[in-house]
Curated annotation (Swiss-Prot):
GO MF, any single term: argininosuccinate synthase activity
UniProt lineage: Bacteria, Pseudomonadati, Pseudomonadota, Gammaproteobacteria, Chromatiales
Residue numbers binding L-aspartate: T120, N124, D125
Protein name: Argininosuccinate synthase
Quaternary structure annotation from Swiss-Prot or TrEMBL: Homotetramer.
Source species: Nitrosococcus oceani (strain ATCC 19707 / BCRC 17464 / JCM 30415 / NCIMB 11848 / C-107)
Keywords in alphabetical order: Amino-acid biosynthesis, Arginine biosynthesis, ATP-binding, Cytoplasm, Ligase, Nucleotide-binding
PROSITE patterns found in the cross-reference section: ARGININOSUCCIN_SYN_1, ARGININOSUCCIN_SYN_2
Top-level enzyme category: ligase
Localization of this protein: Cytoplasm
NCBIfam families per UniProt: argG (TIGR00032), PRK00509.1 (NF001770)
Listed EC numbers: 6.3.4.5
Gene: argG
Amino acid sequence: MSTIKKVVLAYSGGLDTSVILKWLQETYDCEVVTFTADIGQGEEVAPARAKAETLGVKEIYIEDLREEFCRDYVFPMFRANTLYEGEYLLGTSIARPLIAKRLAEIASATGADAVAHGATGKGNDQVRFELGVYALQPDIQVIAPWREWDLTSREKLLAYAETHGIPVEGKRGGRSPYSMDANLLHISYEGGPLEDPWFEPEESMWRWTTSPEASADQAAYLELDYRCGDIVAINGEVLSPAKVLESLNQLGSKHGIGRLDLVENRYVGMKSRGCYETPAGTIMLKAHRALESLTLDREVTHLKDELMPRYANLIYNGYWWSPERSLLQQLIDGSQVTVNGTVRLKLYKGNVVVVGRRSETDSLFAPEIATFEDDAGAYNQQDAEGFIKLNALRLRIEALKKQTH
């Protein structure tokens, strides 16, 4: 422990990380540098500075990373139509690589020996943070207090805070029963009553979205303009990546879009039940697939669909900074050169309905061939006979073999 002189702590300013800050000072007798990231969690991050100063911190980093988060992490992920286990839009997972990157960079800039985080020893985030940091700063040490200390309950954390004069807003008995995580892409809920997979959460749990039943009775139409697989404008208004998510979150929430309740397989081996609200991401996934259906070659589309689960697993498990994720990203990004155009959507009571798609430059839809009417010889239907016979050849050989036995 004595070899660690300076630690960079991923610091939210909440109870857990404030206790960790003091615990690091006492346990390691080290200087602590705090890093607080604004990735759109909807909380004021400025109070983290005052609290860190109260606890004697001299080097404090508070950074607005919303645009970088959306531009360099969320948008590239959506180019792949990424879903983990067919449902989860990876809202928590995709935020961790950026935080790990800044932890490693700040450690290097400040001469820190170690980084620390507040992830528990039972979850995926400890893996994501640490794999990311090691990939970028291979000689760094990592301190994970939840794997070391005996403060195993909120009551113990509160008692520690009171004993050490740590300012705490939430007192005993006055908090949500859920463990929550939020950023511009989503908000998640775990723990508490949700640990019973049969339990239906109360309507009051959902903080972002109106229930589909109570959502607007009038459908909303919108048009999303894409360039190289990324949304660049909504209803003709050019927006930055972060503004795209903010706008779609507002629209989707109003129309009851983006709720998800699932049991997922954690990388650390257990099953976990979580509820998520991802209005913007739900809209983005539907729209992106619609435009790809118009502009991507069939085999390219199918290859992307085959690779997507592997890509999703890499993000979920914490391998964003791995060479294999980078290689897949190059392939995915290369496929997006032709994903240019506009998608028209209807939002209504929890549904995202594609009602139109067009691309003036890259559409592979050939109406003169696909038409049910007279195609003026553009497609010779007689050619289909040979195509079918050749593709049926192996099936016929197999059937004949069975008949002779």
